[in-house]
C-alpha cells in the first residue's frame, strides 16, 4: 500500500512542514506515504484565459510525468464528490479490496488542474465548495488519510 500526495508548488512555511511531518510519522505504521511537489508556473494577476490555460497545461504536464500507469489517481476538485471521513475510509478500503494499492492524490495549482489531469483521474474528491490555500489542503488531506486508516482499522482516533 502506497499513498502519494502530488502537489503543485512548494511548502514554504515551517508550520505547514511540521504538520505534514507529524502526519507522515503517524501514517508510518499503516502505509508508505510520499509527498511530491512539482514546480508551479509564475502566474501574474490579471492573466487572460489563454494564459491561465497555458499555466495549467505546463503544471499538468509536470503532474502527469509523476504518475505511474498503474496508479489510482484521486484529484481534489471543487466539483468532486464530497465524502464524510467514514466515506473516504470506505472508498479507499473498497479500492484496496479490488487490488488497488498505489494511490496518488493530486492537488493543483492556484488556477486549478488541466483537463488532461482531470481525464487521468479515477476519482474526483471535494472537501468543500470553498477554496482553500493549497498548503492548508495538504495538511487537511494528509490528516483525513490518517483518519481513514484509523477508521478502517477500527481504532480510537476517529470520533
UniProtKB/Swiss-Prot annotation:
Protein's job: Specifically methylates the pseudouridine at position 1915 (m3Psi1915) in 23S rRNA.
Swiss-Prot/TrEMBL keywords: Cytoplasm, Methyltransferase, rRNA processing, S-adenosyl-L-methionine, Transferase
Family that this chain belongs to: Belongs to the RNA methyltransferase RlmH family.
Assembly mode: Homodimer.
EC number, as in UniProt: 2.1.1.177
Enzyme class: transferase
Predominant location: cytoplasm
One Pfam short name: SPOUT_MTase
Location(s) in or outside the cell: Cytoplasm
Reaction(s) catalysed (UniProt annotation): pseudouridine(1915) in 23S rRNA + S-adenosyl-L-methionine = N(3)-methylpseudouridine(1915) in 23S rRNA + S-adenosyl-L-homocysteine + H(+)
Protein name as catalogued: Ribosomal RNA large subunit methyltransferase H
UniProt-listed PANTHER family: METHYLTRANSFERASE, RIBOSOMAL RNA LARGE SUBUNIT METHYLTRANSFERASE H
Binding-site positions, S-adenosyl-L-methionine: 76, 108, 127-132
Protein's UniProt keywords contain S-adenosyl-L-methionine: yes
Superkingdom field: Bacteria
GO cellular component, one term: cytoplasm
Organism whose genome encodes this protein: Staphylococcus aureus (strain MSSA476)
One example GO MF annotation: rRNA (pseudouridine-N3-)-methyltransferase activity
InterPro entries per record: Alpha/beta_knot_MTases, RlmH-like, tRNA_m1G_MTases_N
Amino acid at each position: 500500500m502506497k499513498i502519494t500526495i502530488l502537489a503543485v508548488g512548494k511548502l514554504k512555511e515551517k508550520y505547514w512542514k511540521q504538520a505534514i511531518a507529524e502526519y507522515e510519522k503517524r501514517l508510518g505504521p499503516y502505509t508508505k506515504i510520499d509527498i511530491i511537489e512539482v514546480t508551479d508556473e509564475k502566474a501574474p494577476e490579471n492573466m487572460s484565459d489563454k494564459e491561465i490555460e497555458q499555466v495549467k497545461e505546463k503544471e499538468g504536464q509536470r503532474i502527469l510525468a509523476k504518475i505511474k500507469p498503474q496508479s489510482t489517481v484521486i484529484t481534489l476538485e471543487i466539483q468532486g464528490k464530497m465524502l464524510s471521513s467514514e466515506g473516504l475510509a470506505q472508498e479507499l478500503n473498497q479500492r484496496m479490496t479490488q487490488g488497488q494499492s498505489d494511490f496518488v492524490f493530486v492537488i493543483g495549482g492556484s488556477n486549478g488542474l488541466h483537463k488532461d489531469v482531470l481525464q487521468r483521474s479515477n476519482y474526483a474528491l471535494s472537501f468543500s465548495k470553498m477554496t482553500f490555500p493549497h498548503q492548508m489542503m495538504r495538511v487537511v488531506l494528509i490528516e483525513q488519510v490518517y483518519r481513514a486508516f484509523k477508521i478502517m482499522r477500527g481504532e480510537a482516533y476517529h470520533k
